[in-house]
Each structure stands twice: as structure tokens, then as C-alpha cells.
């Protein structure tokens, strides 16, 4: 089974992708070693945080809240906005180079007036005051610890509505990171370049060929189904330092693409760079039933995950997904993969079940 191991990270349960137990014992040991290295890397990070608490409580940690100030806020429409926060003290650890695409992670933001916290998935972006543009962080740059978020205001969303009304410079409290999903560790793997995100279109194809040929392990592909602000989970994997090495077949549903604001051009650049196969569905133009029918027609059958294999080639055209991740409102998750019960994944249903996917290769994100 793909879902075999559970890891408790603070109050969260994460799952790891791993190969079928039918493989050889050598392969099993190879995978287990990789998992241990991954856990070791994250544990080292958490240990660093815990042991430094008494000396420095300014570094981001899952065990206590750290103060950040709102450094930029931009309305996309009446419901969606971008938020950038800056720590009061520069962060010593580059969270993006530490987590890479081996971990999907989030942080908790506290609403002190009603004493609730809400999880948000950060993106490696920063606001450039000179150009007034949103920029993708480059390798080695953590912008001193800035975190950027794409947020929607809901009527019953206490934290989002509170954040939207706060002025620039207001102090908020954040803790984390909390790992929401953990991919296999790739020992000694080289970083995947992000140069294509900063290059002219005419140079992207050549750059992809060069950097792909340097992989140590054979990349694997995944499918992601997102709706609304759930798009941030896919963008974190695609934009983080040392991003996802395979191809992501991304199905995204929104009322209209305008709700994505400056994130939409980034998605187009990722698509032009063969990082993602993008399919966007707008409910302004199609009914929910028509959207689901269109999605079902494009769902690829699941392929077995074969573990860490030596690199042979990259095929950006014939995607062979070994995993499906689903993130969005409850009704969307239920339609795509069956209902999720808080920390319990629940049985796989919906469109994915009809196309041969099951609990071995589907994971529902909150």
C-alpha cells in the first residue's frame, strides 16, 4: 500500500508516499532509509527550534508564536487578497531551502480576539516596492523570513476577515511549520533549477533539457485537484526552492481566473516551462456538473510507485501519476475523492474512485 506510515507532527497527521510492499526487501530497506533521512532532516529542524527556545524565541517554531508585521496587503477582488508578513527579527534559517518540495507545509496564524488559530499555506513570494510586483524568491533568498499568503474571506472565516481588516504594520503572531504531507527523501539529489521562472520564453526549452539531465533519481508524476485558495498547495510544490521534479497534472476550479490575480501569470509560466499540465475550470462559464464531467474525462489512471530508481529520462508529455492530492472546500473534496472526516481521510469516492484510484494513492488535504 502507498499509505502505510503515519507521522504525528504536533496536532497533525501526515502521510508519506512509498512503494508497494510487493517490492524486494532491498528496495524496502532503501526506501525506509530514505524515509528515516527525511524524518531526520525535519527532526533536526524541530530540535534546533526546541533547543534554541530559551536563547531565542524570535525564530519561527511550531512550539510557540512569533511576531510578524503586515508588510503588504493587496485586494484581488472583494473576497480574495494577498498578504505578506515580515518577522520583527530576521530569520536565520531559510525555511524554503530546508523544506524544499519534499514537504507540503503550513503555519498557524492566531486571532487573539476570539482565541482561534487558522492554518495557511505560505508561498515563496515577496512584494517589490519599487516595481509594485510580486516576485518569486530565488535560491538562497528567504527575504529575511517574509511569508506570503493567498487568502479568501468567508462569512464564517473569523481569521481571514480579521486579517483583511488589519492595517499595514499591524503585528500578528504565527507558529509553524506544520507538515501536511511528506514526499520520499531523495538522498544527495541535486536541486532542480528555477531559472526558467525568471527567463525569457525563448530560452525555457533549452534550460529544461539541461537541468533535467542532471537528476540522480527518476522523477515521478502526480495529479493535483484544487479549488479556490487550495491552489496554494500546488504552487508551494512548484515554486519552492528545489521544486517538485516530476510533472504535476493540475486541475484547478475557480469562479473565474481573475480571482487568481498575479498567481495566474505564474501558473502560465510554469506551464510553459513543462512543470505543470494545467487545466482550469471556471464556474462562471460552466455548471458544476459540466465541470465535473470535464474533469472526469481528463483524469489519468493511477500508476504504481516504484521507489527510488536511477534517472533514465524525463517525459513531459505522457504523464504517469502515482499519487493524487485533493485540496479545496469540503464539497469539492467530496465530489473529487469522497468526504474527508477531519484527521480521518475517509474512504475514497467521487470521480477518482470511478477511475480506479483508491486509498493507496489518494490523499485529501485540509
Curated annotation (Swiss-Prot):
Binds 1 FAD per monomer. Keywords: FAD, Flavoprotein, Membrane, Mitochondrion, Mitochondrion inner membrane, NADP, Oxidoreductase, Transit peptide. Its cofactor is FAD. It is found in: Mitochondrion inner membrane. One of its GO terms (biological process) is mitochondrial membrane organization. Its main location: mitochondrion. GO terms for cellular component: mitochondrial inner membrane; mitochondrion. It is a peripheral membrane protein. Residues 63-184 form the FAD-binding FR-type domain. It is an enzyme of class 1 (oxidoreductase). CDD domains: cyt_b5_reduct_like. GO terms for molecular function: oxidoreductase activity. The keyword Cell wall biogenesis/degradation does not apply. Residues 1-50 form a transit peptide. Its EC number is 1.-.-.-. Present with 2730 molecules/cell in log phase SD medium. Redox component that participates in c-type cytochrome biogenesis in the mitochondrial intermembrane space. May play a role in the reduction of heme prior to its ligation to apocytochrome c by cytochrome c heme lyase. Has oxidoreductase activity in vitro. This is Cytochrome c mitochondrial import factor CYC2. It comes from Saccharomyces cerevisiae (strain ATCC 204508 / S288c) (Baker's yeast). The lineage of its organism: Eukaryota, Fungi, Dikarya, Ascomycota, Saccharomycotina.
Amino acid at each position: 500500500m502507498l499509505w502505510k506510515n503515519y507521522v504525528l507532527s504536533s496536532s497533525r497527521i501526515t502521510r508519506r508516499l512509498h512503494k508497494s510492499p510487493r517490492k524486494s526487501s532491498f528496495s524496502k530497506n532503501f526506501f525506509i532509509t530514505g524515509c528515516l533521512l527525511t524524518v531526520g532532516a525535519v527532526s533536526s529542524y524541530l530540535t534546533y527550534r526546541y533547543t534554541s527556545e530559551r536563547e531565542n524565541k524570535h525564530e519561527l517554531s511550531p512550539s510557540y508564536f512569533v511576531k510578524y508585521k503586515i508588510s503588504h496587503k493587496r485586494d484581488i477582488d472583494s473576497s480574495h487578497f494577498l498578504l505578506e508578513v515580515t518577522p520583527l527579527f530576521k530569520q536565520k534559517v531559510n525555511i524554503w531551502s530546508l523544506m524544499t518540495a519534499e514537504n507540503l507545509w503550513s503555519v498557524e496564524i492566531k486571532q487573539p480576539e476570539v482565541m482561534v488559530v487558522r492554518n495557511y499555506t505560505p508561498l515563496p513570494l515577496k512584494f517589490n516596492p519599487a516595481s509594485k510586483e510580486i516576485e518569486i524568491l530565488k535560491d538562497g533568498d528567504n527575504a529575511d523570513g517574509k511569508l506570503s499568503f493567498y487568502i479568501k474571506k468567508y462569512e464564517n472565516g473569523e481569521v481571514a476577515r480579521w486579517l483583511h481588516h488589519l492595517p499595514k504594520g499591524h503585528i500578528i503572531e504565527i507558529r509553524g511549520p506544520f507538515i501536511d504531507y511528506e514526499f520520499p527523501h531523495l538522498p544527495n539529489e541535486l536541486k532542480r533549477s528555477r531559472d526558467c521562472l525568471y527567463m525569457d520564453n525563448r530560452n525555457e526549452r533549452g534550460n529544461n533539457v539541461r537541468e533535467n539531465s542532471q537528476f540522480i533519481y527518476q522523477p515521478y508524476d502526480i495529479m493535483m485537484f484544487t479549488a479556490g485558495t487550495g491552489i496554494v498547495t500546488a504552487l508551494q510544490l512548484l515554486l519552492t526552492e528545489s521544486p517538485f521534479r516530476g510533472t504535476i497534472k493540475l486541475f484547478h476550479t475557480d469562479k473565474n481566473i481573475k480571482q487568481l490575480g498575479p498567481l495566474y501569470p505564474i501558473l502560465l509560466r510554469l506551464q510553459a516551462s513543462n512543470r505543470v499540465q494545467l487545466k482550469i475550470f471556471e464556474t462562471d462559464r460552466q455548471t458544476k456538473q459540466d465541470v465535473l464531467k470535464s474533469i472526469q474525462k481528463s483524469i489519468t489512471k493511477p500508476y504504481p510507485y516504484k521507489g527510488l530508481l536511477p534517472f533514465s529520462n524525463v517525459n513531459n508529455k505522457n504523464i504517469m501519476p502515482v499519487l493524487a492530492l485533493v485540496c479545496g472546500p469540503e464539497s469539492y473534496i467530496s465530489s473529487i475523492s469522497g468526504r474527508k472526516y477531519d484527521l480521518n481521510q475517509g474512504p475514497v469516492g467521487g470521480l477518482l474512485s470511478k477511475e480506479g484510484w483508491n486509498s493507496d494513492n489518494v490523499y485529501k488535504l485540509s
